[in-house]
Amino acid sequence: MALKKPKKSRLTTEEIKQQLEGSTIKEQSITKEVETSFLDYSMSVIVARALPDVRDGFKPVHRRALFAAFENGMTHDKPYKKSARWVGDVIGKYHPHGDQAVYQTIVRMAQDFSMRYLLVDGHGNFGSIDGDSAAAMRYTEARLSKISYELLKYIDKETVDFVPNYDASEQEPSVLPSGFPNLLTNGTTGIAVGMATNIPPHNLTEVCQAIKAYAKNHNVTISEIMEYLKGPDFPTGAEIYGDSGIIKYFNTGRGSVTIRSKYEIEDIGQGRVAIVVTEIPYMVNKANLIEKIVELVTNKQIEGISDLRDESSRDGIRIVIEVKRDVIPEVLLNKLFKTTPLQTNFSVNNLALVNGVPMVLNIKEMIKYYFEHQIEILVRRTNFDLKKAKERIHIVEGLVIAVNNIDEVIKIIKASGDDDIASKSLIQRFDLTELQTKAILEMRLRALTGLNIDKLKKEYEDLILVIKDLEDVLNNYNRQVNIICENLDYLIEKFGDERRTEIMYGVSSHIDDEDLIPVEDIVVTMSKRGYFKRLPIDTYKNQRRGGVGVQGLKTYEDDDVEKILVANTHTDLLFFSDLGRVYRLRGHEVPLGSRQSKGIPAINFLPIEKSESILTILPIDNYDQGSLFFTTSKGIIKRANLSDFESIRANGKIAITLKDGDKLFSVMQTLGNDEVFIGASNGNVIRFNENDAREMGRIATGVKGINLENDEYVVGTGLSSHGEYVLAVGSKGLGKLTDINDYRLTKRGAKGVNTLKVNDKTGNLVSIKVVNREEEALIITTSGKVIRLSIKDISVIGRNTSGVKLISLENKEEVKSIAIFKKEEINDEQLLQENDYNLK
């Protein structure tokens, strides 16, 4: 049996402390250490990595990359150099981090879809808006762009402070002179610890004009600045919807801007159109955008797209979305805007370092700090030039003395054993300074003897003027402002361009589909089996009385037309079912069809039960006007307040409680003192005041309206407010107009009086309508044929007559229903444009 090793006892805290005495290890609270270390790390990320300086708009990695290129002569007028060479210089001298981090920084500054104004001129594959990566740095070449020179110009004139690099072997600028307002024009984005920045790009011309406005009046308001600086201007163009977000971030430094793709609707022939997207929102990956649309179509979350393809090229973006025939392109676009990156929100957070401290800045503060930086650069540059001018004039003064005494100067130099003796001798003889004697001694004798006294005097006089001018600049603030403004004008002239992003003022990014649908008159038809469709009113010809008609509704062999009405695309349509329930749709929500199409069954677009069918439809424009007047096939009537039907749930609600064997025939909107007309299949019509039926609750059954016998049933209803005549139409195509005053006013519940002499020639009374002479009628037959005619062309005849022929019928064809509407007459010669919609 093996012996177990004795367990080592754990050291106590005191024993550990004793062992640590005299060592370099210090005892520290873990809580305090974590707090201190994390704070140090956070500040390092904020100040030295993630946030831009408000003066030049750069993070350290961008600043170091640009300075390294400038230092190595990689300017726009020099040949391209390998990107790997550039990256190596940055890493080796200034930025000891990963090569890919530095390379991606350079790549982004060369991408025209990322930068509003390119700072790097790239040669080779620098990535694409589809998210393609740039080629490896060993393959690509780059150099600074023309505008980058403005950022670094005068850096050699002590305009900015230099600091040691990471190992104190080199000096790097703490900030760039930035003669070009980079932060405002190119923007930036970055995530620090506990904070993030997201500054949008703006148009250079507008930014320069805004800075000039501030330079000339430091009390300029943000509203006045907005007269020059309109808002963001993104490299990818697109449109900004509304200016409320712009106003907010201009004033507070924070806000949200809605960016929407720019598009055109093109006709692609055969009655079809395509949505062509030409500009997309900033920072949107085009490939991912297309993939998202495909995903939504595949999952049937978006319907109405027949084809999608990317035809983008070097000339620009072109995403083609082919639209199905039965889809309104603006409505489809609105859905795409809501569900895809075709519309995005840019959340602005103007966070930048001000004297090393992170601050959220409004637009005026950003302009202010940039302007103050330019004043400082100008002053430091002027001081540098002044110092150099004074040094030069001092040298020129010495050279003038030397030329005036050239023989003696040469004699002293030749007689001296070395430069030190010569310098002392010249100083002693001519009262020169060491700088002057040094300049004299550094010249060859030939050059010294060749100096022209007149040229020296001219240079001296010029230097006097230069010094005077430079001193005036330093002492005159107005001159400093003017110089800054002149530089801004130079930037506008050389680099200014037109705005790419259009701002849509006074609009909302939240647009309902209906806002995009034009208000148009429509015809809604319903078949006996419950098939519905919507057609433009102009689908039908206006024909004279007795015309043959056009095919208006294609139905199944055992189906025929039941109802037809006229409304518009924005009208509320209340669908009343045989079970006494009501459902609501807008006119444009009814499936669109053509003259020959079958239509769509109600169960496909209404939440009805399988045993339920729609019997009538009522268009409503205003729920505050009047009542609803219900009539059933058995002559039961009910009056209800229209406002009770304004709020209808998605699954509908009860409209009337029906007795066994009865069904709803019609629902009319009354105005409070209307006279009601009800026609029966026996040819009788009753006329009574609507107030004979008191208003009842929504689920009430109602009272008797007309006295019917045996198998008689209601065939038509109307109101006195509808017109001056009763239009009566028989099943055989005969009809007539009769003055409403020919019908005596009775109480509800009576049998009524005869309106159509029913016989084999007329057939049963099919429908009655109350009309006026300015209206028009659509008459629809059991075969689906439709004729449109003017009421004024129908004869006015007495009550107890058969009428005249309104429509020519074939074989066993009969009149099924009629609809009345107001419409400008269309001449017989006018051709109709066939709307060949393909319903799926």
UniProtKB/Swiss-Prot annotation:
GO terms for cellular component: chromosome; cytoplasm; DNA topoisomerase type II (double strand cut, ATP-hydrolyzing) complex. It is found in: Cytoplasm. One of its GO terms (molecular function) is DNA binding. InterPro entries: GyrA (IPR005743), GyrA/parC_rep (IPR006691), Gyrase/topoIV_suA_C (IPR035516), Topo_IIA-like_dom_sf (IPR013760), Topo_IIA_A/C_ab (IPR013758), Topo_IIA_A_a_sf (IPR013757), Topo_IIA_dom_A (IPR002205), Type_II_DNA_Topoisomerases (IPR050220). Residues 51-516 form the Topo IIA-type catalytic domain. Its EC number is 5.6.2.2. It comes from the Bacteria. Heterotetramer, composed of two GyrA and two GyrB chains. In the heterotetramer, GyrA contains the active site tyrosine that forms a transient covalent intermediate with DNA, while GyrB binds cofactors and catalyzes ATP hydrolysis. This is DNA gyrase subunit A.
